[in-house]
UniProtKB/Swiss-Prot annotation:
Pfam families: Ribosomal_L30. Part of the 50S ribosomal subunit. Gene3D superfamilies: 1.10.15.30, Ribosomal protein L30, ferredoxin-like fold domain. This is Large ribosomal subunit protein uL30. One of its GO terms (biological process) is translation. One of its GO terms (molecular function) is RNA binding. The keyword Kinase does not apply. It comes from Methanoculleus marisnigri (strain ATCC 35101 / DSM 1498 / JR1). GO terms for cellular component: cytosolic large ribosomal subunit. SUPFAM superfamilies: Ribosomal protein L30p/L7e. The lineage of its organism: Archaea, Methanobacteriati, Methanobacteriota, Stenosarchaea group, Methanomicrobia.
Amino acid sequence: MYAVVQVRGVVKTNHEIKDTLKMLRLHHVNHCVLVPDTPAYLGMIRKVKDFVAYGEVDKDTLATLLRTRGRLTGDEKLTDEYVRAHTPYADIDEFAAALCDGEMSFRDLVEIKPVLRLHPPRKGYKTIKRTFQQGGALGYYGPQINDLLYKMR
């Protein structure tokens, strides 16, 4: 499972980029979505790689994000009680593990909001004009996306 975070805004960009970000449900900077590892999603991510940071998220980071930033309709927090009542899992940690393993989908919970609204990273981005490999904040992070997500929790 990939975590995709929008890093740059879309003013004066190609309409195809804007449409792809809209399909990924990334409407604002510092919003995060979780997408499965499928060729269709990877193609969309590659198209917007100059505007997002993405990588493979692990179970612990995903559980932390769901606890702090997971929201239900009505802007209520995602709780262990809600997960216990609406899934076969006992708490958010087990639900996050099932999400990472592909056993469960974010869409299986009807009332959960698909976008995680994150804070800007503590200590800031390095630069939003260069890729991660060049010392910036854009593009493919790999497993190091967990460090960025922890700073944005």
